[in-house]
Protein backbone atom coordinates (compact mmCIF):
# COMPACT_ATOMS: atom_id res chain seq x y z
CA UNK A 1 0.00 0.00 0.00
CA UNK A 2 1.58 3.29 -1.08
CA UNK A 3 2.05 5.93 1.58
CA UNK A 4 2.04 9.03 -0.63
CA UNK A 5 0.26 10.30 -3.73
CA UNK A 6 3.44 10.05 -5.77
CA UNK A 7 3.94 6.46 -4.62
CA UNK A 8 0.37 5.64 -5.68
CA UNK A 9 1.02 7.15 -9.12
CA UNK A 10 4.28 5.24 -9.40
CA UNK A 11 2.45 2.04 -8.51
CA UNK A 12 -0.14 2.61 -11.24
CA UNK A 13 2.57 3.45 -13.76
CA UNK A 14 4.56 0.38 -12.77
CA UNK A 15 1.55 -1.89 -13.19
CA UNK A 16 0.83 -0.50 -16.69
CA UNK A 17 4.45 -1.06 -17.69
CA UNK A 18 4.47 -4.57 -16.23
CA UNK A 19 1.43 -5.54 -18.29
CA UNK A 20 2.86 -3.97 -21.44
CA UNK A 21 6.19 -5.76 -20.96
CA UNK A 22 4.40 -9.03 -20.26
CA UNK A 23 2.54 -8.68 -23.56
CA UNK A 24 5.78 -8.26 -25.53
CA UNK A 25 7.49 -11.17 -23.78
CA UNK A 26 4.47 -13.38 -24.34
CA UNK A 27 4.26 -12.52 -28.04
CA UNK A 28 7.95 -13.31 -28.49
CA UNK A 29 7.63 -16.65 -26.70
CA UNK A 30 4.56 -17.53 -28.77
CA UNK A 31 6.30 -16.87 -32.10
CA UNK A 32 9.36 -18.86 -30.98
CA UNK A 33 7.18 -21.81 -29.99
CA UNK A 34 5.32 -21.68 -33.31
CA UNK A 35 8.61 -21.60 -35.24
CA UNK A 36 10.01 -24.56 -33.31
CA UNK A 37 6.83 -26.56 -33.86
CA UNK A 38 6.93 -25.86 -37.61
CA UNK A 39 10.60 -26.81 -37.78
CA UNK A 40 9.90 -30.10 -35.99
CA UNK A 41 7.09 -30.77 -38.45
CA UNK A 42 9.49 -30.09 -41.34
CA UNK A 43 7.61 -27.12 -42.80
CA UNK A 44 10.62 -24.87 -43.39
CA UNK A 45 8.82 -22.34 -45.60
CA UNK A 46 6.21 -21.57 -42.95
CA UNK A 47 8.90 -21.68 -40.26
CA UNK A 48 10.89 -19.04 -42.14
CA UNK A 49 7.89 -16.69 -42.14
CA UNK A 50 7.23 -17.22 -38.43
CA UNK A 51 10.93 -16.79 -37.62
CA UNK A 52 10.76 -13.38 -39.30
CA UNK A 53 7.87 -12.45 -37.04
CA UNK A 54 9.72 -13.80 -34.00
CA UNK A 55 12.85 -11.80 -34.78
CA UNK A 56 10.82 -8.65 -35.34
CA UNK A 57 8.97 -9.13 -32.07
CA UNK A 58 12.18 -9.84 -30.14
CA UNK A 59 13.78 -6.69 -31.57
CA UNK A 60 10.78 -4.57 -30.64
CA UNK A 61 10.61 -6.07 -27.15
CA UNK A 62 14.29 -5.25 -26.66
CA UNK A 63 13.84 -1.74 -28.02
CA UNK A 64 10.96 -1.12 -25.64
CA UNK A 65 12.88 -2.51 -22.67
CA UNK A 66 10.66 -5.54 -22.09
CA UNK A 67 13.72 -7.80 -22.44
CA UNK A 68 17.43 -7.08 -22.48
CA UNK A 69 19.02 -6.64 -25.91
CA UNK A 70 21.48 -9.49 -25.26
CA UNK A 71 18.57 -11.75 -24.33
CA UNK A 72 16.90 -10.92 -27.63
CA UNK A 73 20.14 -11.51 -29.52
CA UNK A 74 20.68 -14.87 -27.83
CA UNK A 75 17.15 -16.06 -28.60
CA UNK A 76 17.41 -14.96 -32.24
CA UNK A 77 20.78 -16.65 -32.58
CA UNK A 78 19.55 -19.96 -31.16
CA UNK A 79 16.46 -19.90 -33.35
CA UNK A 80 18.45 -19.20 -36.52
CA UNK A 81 21.09 -21.78 -35.60
CA UNK A 82 18.41 -24.47 -35.36
CA UNK A 83 16.72 -23.32 -38.58
CA UNK A 84 19.98 -23.18 -40.56
CA UNK A 85 20.94 -26.67 -39.37
CA UNK A 86 17.62 -28.01 -40.67
CA UNK A 87 18.04 -26.22 -44.00
CA UNK A 88 21.57 -27.59 -44.35
CA UNK A 89 20.38 -31.12 -43.55
CA UNK A 90 17.57 -30.79 -46.09
CA UNK A 91 20.04 -29.64 -48.78
CA UNK A 92 22.42 -32.51 -48.04
CA UNK A 93 19.56 -35.01 -48.31
CA UNK A 94 18.63 -33.53 -51.67
CA UNK A 95 22.20 -33.81 -52.96
CA UNK A 96 22.53 -37.41 -51.78
CA UNK A 97 19.29 -38.38 -53.51
CA UNK A 98 20.26 -36.72 -56.79
CA UNK A 99 23.57 -38.58 -57.06
UniProtKB/Swiss-Prot annotation:
Listed GO biological process terms: translation
Highest taxon of the lineage: Bacteria
GO cellular component terms given for this protein: cytosol; small ribosomal subunit
Molecular functions (GO terms): small ribosomal subunit rRNA binding; structural constituent of ribosome
Residue ranges of coiled coil: none
Keywords: Ribonucleoprotein, Ribosomal protein, RNA-binding, rRNA-binding
Protein function: Binds directly to 16S ribosomal RNA.
Protein family per UniProt: Belongs to the bacterial ribosomal protein bS20 family.
UniProt name for this protein: Small ribosomal subunit protein bS20
Species per Swiss-Prot/TrEMBL record: Thermomicrobium roseum (strain ATCC 27502 / DSM 5159 / P-2)
